[in-house]
């Protein structure tokens, strides 16, 4: 077998592999000898079939199997021999000429194929002893814990029916029917709907017109759907709602005590406070983690500059761009609305994709050298977390991860990345700094976020930069969540 390098340009490689017809025939004869005693052909005793006859009957099919095995097994063997790692699955090109293919299968012509791939660049790791990061830690006061508990307590608040008029804060139970131009519309009808006046659950102007109603009242109110309302057929339209008031109920007092804790399934108010404080600490801890991670990645980005495999960049950019398109479609906006053009946005997000791939390769190399591994138990926990996100779709998700090549890598990559960050935090200089929650949650204006002034793209860019690339720089498709049930048309979905 001859292995000839025909292209070595940057990270691109092209290898020509030639296996002589004589070699292929020899392999075929070996395979025929293996099956000689096993085949049964009419007119011949077992084991007495001439090789020439076997070749006539089975030659082409065996040769086809050999070709498939060579194409499957040789590329990784060749890469290993060359000491190279391919960024993606190497592309294999063979002759498409039918006559030439027939000659190869008949062992009358050499079998040739070409491998095309991009190599993962060799990365010489640098010391991170000079990397300095500030770990912001927010203090959590009792007032904040109390405020959060009171918000939670709203779900357990009791209401008592009253005879008077509805006031702000009261809960009304109503039937309603919405119409546009006198015609009822989908999602505009409900019965026994409970609404707390002032909760701003419904579109602007709806709740305010319920102030003063009493049980038994029938009323028609007029509102205008917001211009940005998700349902295009209702956005900006004036609508009427025929309302029947069934009950008006006044809110009970909310107190943080053992009774409230009991309603929430806890043994005491102290335990409730402890849990809420822990939740707040966890939320702030996630922000702290992402900010520290961002600082590390920014400095690694400055330390490592090298060419990136374009196929990985293409895949990463495609993933980012799909999300940008989705964000714009959902917001009903265009690039022009965001003071940019598609060309400029593509350029910005292309740079982001290159950064993510480059950092992914760096983190992969750091992790490999540090002996970072992802355990089977960690993968199982990640899979369980996926299942929790898609209730009712457990079987489909399990089948997806079992049957989709690369799907498990999609679970492994973020775990691997976080473990590499954990490793780096033991190597870099970390300074803790106590800050207010406002300072912790404030956007870092120094971040080089693509489309920083663009509402929809900005959201994606911030998320992309915060999470960065998967350690291997590749993406694997994941099951999409089922769409959430549509809200009633009267409700304001501008969350």
Curated annotation (Swiss-Prot):
Residues 169-254 form the PPIase FKBP-type domain. Keywords: Cell cycle, Cell division, Chaperone, Cytoplasm, Isomerase, Rotamase. It catalyses: [protein]-peptidylproline (omega=180) = [protein]-peptidylproline (omega=0). Pfam families: FKBP_C, Trigger_C, Trigger_N. GO terms for molecular function: peptidyl-prolyl cis-trans isomerase activity; protein folding chaperone; ribosome binding. GO terms for cellular component: cytoplasm. Residues 439-495 are annotated as: Disordered. It is an enzyme of class 5 (isomerase). Transmembrane segments: none annotated. It is found in: Cytoplasm. Its EC number is 5.2.1.8. It comes from the Bacteria. One of its GO terms (biological process) is protein transport. Belongs to the FKBP-type PPIase family. Tig subfamily. Involved in protein export. Acts as a chaperone by maintaining the newly synthesized protein in an open conformation. Functions as a peptidyl-prolyl cis-trans isomerase. Consists of 3 domains; the N-terminus binds the ribosome, the middle domain has PPIase activity, while the C-terminus has intrinsic chaperone activity on its own. This is Trigger factor. The lineage of its organism: Bacteria, Pseudomonadati, Pseudomonadota, Alphaproteobacteria, Hyphomicrobiales.
């Amino acid at each position: 077998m001859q292995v000839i390098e025909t292209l070595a340009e940057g990270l691109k490689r092209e290898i020509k592999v030639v296996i002589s017809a004589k070699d292929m025939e020899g392999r075929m004869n070996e395979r025929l000898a293996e099956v000689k005693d096993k085949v049964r052909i009419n007119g011949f005793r077992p084991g007495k079939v001439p090789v020439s006859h076997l070749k006539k009957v089975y030659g082409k099919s065996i040769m086809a199997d050999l070709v498939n095995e060579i194409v499957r097994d040789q590329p990784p063997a060749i890469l290993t021999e060359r000491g190279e790692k391919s960024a993606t699955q190497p592309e294999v090109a063979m002759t498409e000429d039918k006559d030439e293919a027939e000659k190869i299968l008949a062992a009358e012509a050499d079998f040739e194929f070409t491998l095309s791939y991009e190599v993962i660049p060799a990365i010489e790791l640098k010391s991170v002893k000079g990397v300095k990061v500030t770990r912001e830690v927010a203090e959590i006061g009792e007032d904040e814990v109390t405020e959060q508990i009171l918000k939670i307590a709203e779900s357990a608040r009791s209401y008592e029916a009253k005879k008077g008029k509805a006031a702000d804060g009261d809960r009304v139970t109503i039937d309603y029917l919405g119409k546009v131009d006198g015609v009822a519309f989908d999602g505009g009808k409900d019965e026994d709907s409970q609404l707390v006046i002032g909760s701003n659950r419904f579109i602007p102007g709806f709740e305010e017109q319920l102030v003063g109603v009493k049980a038994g009242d029938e009323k028609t109110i007029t509102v205008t759907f917001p211009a940005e309302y998700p349902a295009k057929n209702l956005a900006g339209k004036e609508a009427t709602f025929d309302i029947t008031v069934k009950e008006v109920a006044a809110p009970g007092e909310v107190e943080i005590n053992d009774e409230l804790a009991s309603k929430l399934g806890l043994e005491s108010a102290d335990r409730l406070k402890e849990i809420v404080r822990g939740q707040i600490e966890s939320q702030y801890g996630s922000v702290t983690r992402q900010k520290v991670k961002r600082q590390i990645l920014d400095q690694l980005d400055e330390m490592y500059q090298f060419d990136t495999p374009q196929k990985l960049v293409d895949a990463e950019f495609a993933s980012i761009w799909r999300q940008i398109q989705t964000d714009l479609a959902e917001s009903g906006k265009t690039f022009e609305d965001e003071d940019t053009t598609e060309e400029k946005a593509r350029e910005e997000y292309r740079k982001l994709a290159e950064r993510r791939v480059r950092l992914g390769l760096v983190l992969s190399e750091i992790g490999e050298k540090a002996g970072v591994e992802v355990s089977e138990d960690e993968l199982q926990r990640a899979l369980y977390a996926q299942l929790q996100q898609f209730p009712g779709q457990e079987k489909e998700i399990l089948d997806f991860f079992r049957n989709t090549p690369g799907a498990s890598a999609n679970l492994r990559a973020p775990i691997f990345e976080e473990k590499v960050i954990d490793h780096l935090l033991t190597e870099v200089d970390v300074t803790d700094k106590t800050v207010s929650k406002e300072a912790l949650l404030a956007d870092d204006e120094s971040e080089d976020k693509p489309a920083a002034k663009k509402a929809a793209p900005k959201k994606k860019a911030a998320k992309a930069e915060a999470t960065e690339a998967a350690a291997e720089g590749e993406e694997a498709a994941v099951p999409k969540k089922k769409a959430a049930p549509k809200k009633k048309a009267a409700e304001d979905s501008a969350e």
